[in-house]
Amino acid sequence: VVLGIDATLEANRDDWFVRETIGMLRRTLARLDVSSRSLYALVEPGSCFAGTLFEIALAADRSYMLDDPWRPSAIALSTMNFGTLPMVNGRSRIASRFYEEAEPIAAAKACIGEMLAPADALALGLVTAAPDDLDWSDELRIALEERAALSPDALTGLEANLRFGIFETMNTRIFGRLSAWENLIYSRPNAVGETGALKRYGSGKKAQFDWKRV
């Protein structure tokens, strides 16, 4: 259904209403790119990560896809994933994911319209990991505990670096990296407060963080 909607949007891009709809989708997804929060996507049976909606998984910092033959899950790509909904750096999320390397982008493009199983999605580099049903809950728990062990402000900056890679624009400087590092890292109590990471560094005491990341 989602792929059919994407095809309709692509076929009618010259219509003013469709053009505005695509623009709204682009702006909405771009807000995820500059979010100060960690974003995880979970691809499970019944998920609808296809075409435009797969952009949400591509915008996430990590994506996990359940590999369970008894409860199959799948993702799918459409032409909307290849430039119609660019990030704030002007590039598609797939291009940014692969640092614009031609070979993996071409491999992904060759699979447009196909329902990709976990093994295929992982081989193409479209998801972070594809644990089986035995490891699924433990992998997610460990992933969340890893994030929770780090300063939320530091993560904001590190995640901004990973999301935009080597491609920088004025938008990413102001609303991505610069905003993260200047406003959320150097001057916040999590770094320089009495119980912050810099104050507690080398003391043997654990830093105490404010987990509100806005």
What are these regions (language model features)?
Residues 1-56, 63-70, 109-120, 138, ...:
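C-terminal alpha-helix plus adjacent terminal tail
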Residues 34-38, 99-104, 123-126:
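Short, surface-exposed connector motifs at secondary-structure boundaries
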Residues 50-109:
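CoA-thioester-processing core
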Residues 60, 126-127:
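A structural motif
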Residues 100, 132, 149-153:
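Alpha-helical structural elements of signaling/regulatory helical domains
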Residues 127-138:
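Short, well-structured beta-strand/strand-turn elements
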